[in-house]
């Protein structure tokens, strides 16, 4: 009875708020199906770490440090960057770069749509965040959860909780974020532009050489990005080599599912009331939304600028698919195109831009690590 009273008496309002946050994440995962693989374990973990005297996280008791399970997992999987890198292998194994390789102009949108990262980074500096904290906040605009986790774990581990929540929540609601921005920046006639798609065969040799070439180029431009881009491209090489089919399927399914579960559960170790319930958390979440909006706008505007020099016009909506939220963003563009003109089929173009965004986001993260690390 004394133990129960001690626990109840140790509750703080911040811990109660975080328990509500945890319950909210679980609700979003189950009821709305927003990134359930990550938000469900993150939400449950948040409840665990905010129980007073919880053995889930490391605690000082009578002058002795008692290590908690989630804290140990955090040190092994996040602090060492192991979990995000394993996720990159899984993501690489899932991606088919054929739509991009058959239409290389889409590379431009994969890079242009990363502008929100650097613009938001500047905004964070204006709000008084340090350079490393600003970079960690800006990388939310990568629309790539593992990249956001990797960079923030390196630069600002104390902000990992709100950055992860913002990144994955906004990725899940891309269908709500992008359409208003796209409509604001385009005319109806622009949204109805049709793009012919002539499927060009991409040889097996090209598919095998592509991940190797990207890794070499990234390594020369930004050596600090090699672990990020290298693990992503290794996963893709496993997919495309044709002799590791069982490993490819295992990476896409078992590896992705298990590591995502551990990643979400482990991130919760940073989501204690003392760390999370601060004014800076609201600022980070708000700036994350700004980053997604700026990414979308940059992609659309890049397409409009490119159209000034092309006789065969690009539908500006395709530029918005250059963010890394794959395949949600490509689906958004396809749906918007069909709403404007049911005969308009933009999916393959949007997928090309979307997978280019996967490369662009990882390279952007690598550049931040290279020049700020």
Model regions and ranges:
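Entry/N-cap segments of selected transmembrane alpha helices
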Residues: 97-121, 272-299, 350-354
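N-terminal alpha-helical transmembrane segments of multi-pass membrane transport
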Residues: 1-65
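Hydrophobic transmembrane alpha-helices of secondary-active transporters
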Residues: 25, 48, 77-101, 235-238, ...
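Transmembrane helical segments that form the transport core of multi-pass membrane transport proteins
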Residues: 214-299
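Juxtamembrane and boundary regions of transmembrane helices in multi-pass small-molecule transporters
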Residues: 122-131, 163-191, 298-311, 356-373
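Alpha-helical transmembrane segments
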Residues: 159-176, 285-294, 318
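Membrane-embedded hairpin module used as a gating/binding unit in multi-pass transport
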Residues: 169-243
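Alpha-helical membrane segments and immediately flanking helix-loop junctions
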Residues: 75-80, 91-94, 109-119, 123, ...
């Amino acid at each position: 009875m004394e133990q129960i009273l001690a626990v109840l008496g140790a509750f703080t309002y911040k811990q109660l708020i975080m328990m509500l946050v945890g319950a909210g994440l679980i609700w979003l995962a189950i009821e709305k199906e927003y990134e359930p693989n990550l938000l469900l374990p993150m939400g449950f973990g948040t409840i665990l770490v905010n129980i007073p005297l919880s053995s889930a996280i490391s605690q000082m008791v009578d002058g002795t440090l008692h290590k908690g399970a989630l804290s140990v997992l955090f040190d092994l999987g996040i602090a060492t960057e192991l979990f995000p890198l394993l996720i990159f292998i899984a993501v690489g194994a899932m991606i088919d770069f054929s739509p991009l390789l058959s239409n290389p102009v889409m590379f431009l949108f994969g890079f242009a749509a990363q502008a929100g990262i650097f613009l938001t980074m500047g905004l964070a500096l204006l709000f008084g965040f340090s350079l490393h904290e600003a970079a960690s906040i800006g990388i939310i605009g990568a629309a790539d959860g593992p990249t956001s986790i990797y960079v923030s774990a390196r630069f600002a581990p104390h902000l990992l909780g709100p950055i992860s929540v913002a990144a994955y929540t906004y990725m899940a609601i891309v269908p709500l974020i992008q359409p208003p921005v796209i409509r604001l920046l385009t005319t109806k006639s622009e949204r109805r532009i049709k793009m012919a798609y002539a499927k060009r065969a991409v040889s097996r040799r090209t598919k095998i050489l592509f991940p190797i070439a990207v890794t070499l180029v990234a390594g020369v431009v930004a050596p600090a990005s090699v672990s990020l881009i290298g693990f992503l491209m290794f996963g893709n090489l496993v997919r495309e080599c044709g002799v590791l089919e069982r490993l490819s399927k295992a990476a896409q399914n078992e590896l992705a599912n298990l590591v995502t579960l551990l990643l979400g559960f482990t991130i919760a170790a940073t989501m204690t009331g003392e760390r999370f319930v601060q004014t800076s958390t609201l600022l980070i979440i708000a700036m994350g939304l700004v980053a997604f909006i700026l990414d979308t706008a940059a992609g659309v505007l890049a397409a409009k600028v490119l159209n000034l020099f092309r006789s065969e016009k690009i539908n500006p909506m395709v530029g918005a698919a250059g963010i890394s939220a794959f395949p949600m963003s490509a689906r958004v563009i396809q749906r918007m195109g069909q709403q404007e003109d049911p005969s308009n089929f933009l999916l393959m173009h949007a997928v090309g831009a979307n997978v280019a965004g996967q490369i662009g986001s990882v390279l952007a993260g690598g550049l931040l690590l290279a020049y700020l690390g």
